[in-house]
Amino acid sequence: DYMVKSKLSIALLMASSLPIGMQANNIIESGDTSRVYDIDEVVVIDQPKEAFRLRQQPLSSTSFNGDLIRSLNVQDVRNLSVFVPSFSMPEYGSRYTSSIYMRGIGSRVYSPAVGIYVDGMPILSKSAFNFHTYDVDRVDVLHGPQGTLYGMNTEGGLIRLYSRNPFQYQGTDVKLSIGTKLHRQIEASHYEKLNDKMAFSVAGFYGGQNGFFRNQYDGSHADLINEFGGKGRFLWRPTDRLNFDFIADYQYTRQNGFPYGQVVTEDELSSATITSPLYGLKVGTQSPNQNRQGNYRRNIINTGLGIKYAGNGFDINSMTSWQFLRDYMLMDI
């Protein structure tokens, strides 16, 4: 009886294991042998001062690709303050004041402590940091000192902007937008690859807004702004080793800047007499009230010629730039 039970148990065990083995064999012998990999978007840029990927370097950084920049509606460097940790670029009432702070390090006036590079071209004047950004394919924000590779004025960090490359993208883009306080904007850009050795891109924009504040003195818009500009880029690759990259960018800004209002405290109101200019006001920041409307006008031209030669085991990179800035500021103090 014991032998019968043992043989029966062995038979049941073999029978129960048979479907499992057959099922395993069916999975292994499946006819679908394709493999699917999910990878992030690849953005190809030319960065001559680095030999490793940004995420492989021993530094803290934040990077934005073109799709993310457009989805976040980034119009200038100030907008990145919302999305980049330890980075701040306050709004002081006009595009003239462009102080940048990284990890608490910055400069209110004179030499900046954070540098900005556009397609490898340094922006030298702090008065030109606050500019309209468009035709941008990638932005890198490097936290901490970068003086070893980028020299002075990068004690706090560095911001690198890269334009869309016409060798990698061809087509025409048009962007229209309208918002509150009659915010209006139009951008147009065209990218064309002439052949395997030459490509170019042209872009232009106009933007404006009536503003959020009224000058109580004459009823005019205290922060009205209108600006426009254009950009051109030409790339030439005569050989596999030699590359030329010419960039020219112009922007004009005219705005009723510095919509500052007086701050009135409760103690000042309690002691104000009927003849005091504070009589009848409310506690807090008052609307602008200036007999001469503050305004700011600025012309910027940035041009650069980048040359790269790839030798056998070495690279030679050169960037020659010329920058022009003329502005006018009127502030009622």
Regions found by a protein language model. Name each.
Residues 168-169, 177, 193-292, 325-333:
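Periplasmic-side early beta-strands and strand-to-turn transitions of outer-membrane beta-barrels
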Residues 3-72, 79-82, 240, 303:
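N-terminal Sec signal peptide and the immediately downstream disordered periplasmic leader
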Residues 285-308:
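Outer-membrane beta-barrel transmembrane strand signature
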Residues 98, 112, 125, 135-137, ...:
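Outer-membrane beta-barrel translocator/receptor signature
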Residues 33-34, 45-59, 66-93, 109-111, ...:
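N-terminal plug
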